[in-house]
């Protein structure tokens, strides 16, 4: 009986070992106030009837990219974008770059750039007399993304 190969615990990526930068109109901001961020690509599929089969096939016909972030309520960068839209009607798109790298892991780092992101909504103002700290959530869409750096394969994967 062969020995089962398992993942080395050090290759589990620490959840907080990341960098996040936002680029708006050529200005690059260190988005260190981010608490979490997640972006995903959802494929659009159509059911395709196939003669001679009782099951339908599924064909990918497109996709959309959405994301969400939670960050500390200590920056006005995104409120400025909302205010600018309110005042001028100009909707500003921006890029988000996320690098995930845990120095303990052997997989190295991964860098993704979310391109042409656009906020769905945003907090204008906020307080909480009973809270510990203030944070805010932001949902957004993206037009594209790029995998700039990818993780190395975990030892034993192949």
Residue spans for each PLM region:
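Short, flexible coil/linker elements and helix-boundary hinge sites characteristic
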Residues: 16, 88-89, 152
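Short acidic DE-rich linear segments
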Residues: 149-158
């Amino acid at each position: 009986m062969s020995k089962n190969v398992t993942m080395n615990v050090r290759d589990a990526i620490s959840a907080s070992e990341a960098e996040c930068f936002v680029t708006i109109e050529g200005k690059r901001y260190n988005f260190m106030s981010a608490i979490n961020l997640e972006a995903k690509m959802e494929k659009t599929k159509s059911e395709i009837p196939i003669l001679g089969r009782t099951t339908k096939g599924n064909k990918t016909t497109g996709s959309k990219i959405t994301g969400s972030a939670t960050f500390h309520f200590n920056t006005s960068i995104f409120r400025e974008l909302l205010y600018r839209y309110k005042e001028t009607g100009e909707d500003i798109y921006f890029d988000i770059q996320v690098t995930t790298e845990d120095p303990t892991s052997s997989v190295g780092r991964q860098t993704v750039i979310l391109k042409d992101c656009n906020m769905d909504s945003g907090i204008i103002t906020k307080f909480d007399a009973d809270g510990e700290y203030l944070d805010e959530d932001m949902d957004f869409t993206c037009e594209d993304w790029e995998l700039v750096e990818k993780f190395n394969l975990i030892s034993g994967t192949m």
